[in-house]
Amino acid sequence: MKHIRNFSIIAHIDHGKSTLSDRLIQVCGGLTDREMAEQVLDSMDLERERGITIKAQSVTLDYTAKNGETYQLNFIDTPGHVDFSYEVSRSLAACEGALLVVDAGQGVEAQTLANCYTALEMDLEVVPVLNKIDLPQAEPERVAAEIEDIVGIEATDAVRCSAKTGVGIGEVLETIVAQIPSPEGDPEAPLQALIIDSWFDSYLGVVSLVRIKNGVLKKGDKFKVMSTGQAYNADRVGIFTPKMKDQAELKTGQVGYVIAGIKEIHGAPVGDTLTLAKHGADKPLPGFKKAKPQVYAGVFTISTDDYESFRDALNKLSLNDASLQFEPETSSALGFGFRIGYLGLLHMEIIQERLEREYDLDLITTAPTVEYEVLLTNGETLYVDNPSDLPATNYIEEMREPIVQANILVPKEYLGNVITLCIEKRGVQKNMVYHGNQVALTYDIPAAEVVMDFFDRLKSTSRGYASLEYNFIRFEPADMVRLDVLINGDRVDALAMIIHRSNIRHKGIALVDKMKELIPRQMFDIAIQAAVGNQVVARSTVKALRKDVTAKCYGGDVSRKKKLLQKQKEGKKRMKQLGNVEVPQEAFLAVLKLNE
């Protein structure tokens, strides 16, 4: 056991952790050179295309150190994007240490900081590594000082390496062996294994990635899941070398997989504890807190026949992504669908893209909203995440919106732009600290403003240098109202949104103008109105197409022309009473892109 090292790599997006993991695998001979693909661990197509890591993956490598001993390194790759910090906390729960990888050209960024604090809170040993020292703009001394200044861990003798060229990889491995503690646990105690991740394989059923904390799990053992009490047989246990490799048993401190032919999807929830069915442990391991969705959106299939397959797809996906939550929803405009809770907008895009890609569905998403706390006049408290569930104004005592604490790191030359952006988003400045060239800002910002497009705007006002990390702190009373869109006097529920009263006119006008461009002209006038309660705040009209009925009259009497025009007018009026307007797909998407 003292030769096992469990660690993960924490880094900001694009600081090179996937490349570094490739090198570690290569040096330890996990794969032959022929099988070595770039970013081995980013196995999803989507991950490769966007160049980001979404799912945590694990690998077990054997490394022969300079002192002649052979160590087993279990290493878990983690995502770096702010939306996936939950995946990171799960990976860290299974480790004793973490490599903090920092790009020697870029320096420390907010996300690195957030994940690093998570690691330090869990009492992990954090080992700084300066990556990309082959770049001409690398300044290892400055960055090492920055790590000490901002993060507060010893970094003067941090390992310097370049994952791309392979320089310094040996030192990284030596440092892991020297600095990261070996796992603690009792091989004789009853089995306790933490489920770090689980996914569905259509051939094997549910595959669970586990970390053995105490005891031993042998192939063929009967084990039970502690939260559900269900028992299964361990058909196969083994490790990833990135390929699956069966073993006779998983010992204390190891990280590996268990396949037990679990068919139903929620059979092995992530964060749960496995123990033996006979002589099991009394209490489960402290898991990690459930991730709470920050953003909600209705998702509907374009053709109603896909509803069943959409539901199955969501079930399979939610197995793989523990933070996904959903419930059925119906809309008069879009039919049947689901209300899905996401961690953030990137998460939302990725889930939608995975559904469309891996399950071949055509989907349409309504505008994302956050969860509001509503105090009713009779003293009840409701939580509303769907604008159409909001009670009428006269029943509402007060609306409270979620406030998040946003920590922003930005180079000082872009400070002005970022502060302007935060004020525009109704933010309140709480703190501002200078660290060398960087400024750390802390703002309280309404969650609704952050989830829409704050991240993209922040990146664009600071040329990509600012970085953001946020977490929910409290609900705060706010003057929020529901903006409805009426088309020919009919409410379209899927277009409603909850916004702040100060934005009504601005948003309302922008919305109706956008809809006017997108709704095709009919044979009659279409009135598009934006209203709050019964008060219309903006309107525009899609003019009717008309036939020139007087074209065949030449000269002649004016009353003849009047008669024809009058007849046309009556026809249009009758059509307008009967006609209903199709709202095209683009119109729903336009609501999402209003701010641009």
Swiss-Prot record:
It is a peripheral membrane protein. Keywords: Cell inner membrane, Cell membrane, GTP-binding, Hydrolase, Membrane, Nucleotide-binding, Protein biosynthesis. Residues 2-184 form the tr-type G domain. The gene is lepA. It comes from Shewanella amazonensis (strain ATCC BAA-1098 / SB2B). GTP binds at D14, H15, G16, K17, S18, T19, N131, K132, I133, D134. SMART domains: EFG_C. Its EC number is 3.6.5.n1. Belongs to the TRAFAC class translation factor GTPase superfamily. Classic translation factor GTPase family. LepA subfamily. It is found in: Cell inner membrane. It holds the Pfam family LepA_C. One of its GO terms (cellular component) is plasma membrane. It catalyses: GTP + H2O = GDP + phosphate + H(+). One of its GO terms (biological process) is positive regulation of translation. InterPro entries: EF-4, EFG_III/V, EFG_V-like, EFTu-like_2, G_TR_CS, LepA_C_sf, LepA_CTD, LepA_IV. This is Elongation factor 4. Required for accurate and efficient protein synthesis under certain stress conditions. May act as a fidelity factor of the translation reaction, by catalyzing a one-codon backward translocation of tRNAs on improperly translocated ribosomes. Back-translocation proceeds from a post-translocation (POST) complex to a pre-translocation (PRE) complex, thus giving elongation factor G a second chance to translocate the tRNAs correctly. Binds to ribosomes in a GTP-dependent manner. It is an enzyme of class 3 (hydrolase). GO terms for molecular function: GTP binding; GTPase activity; guanosine tetraphosphate binding; ribosome binding; translation elongation factor activity.
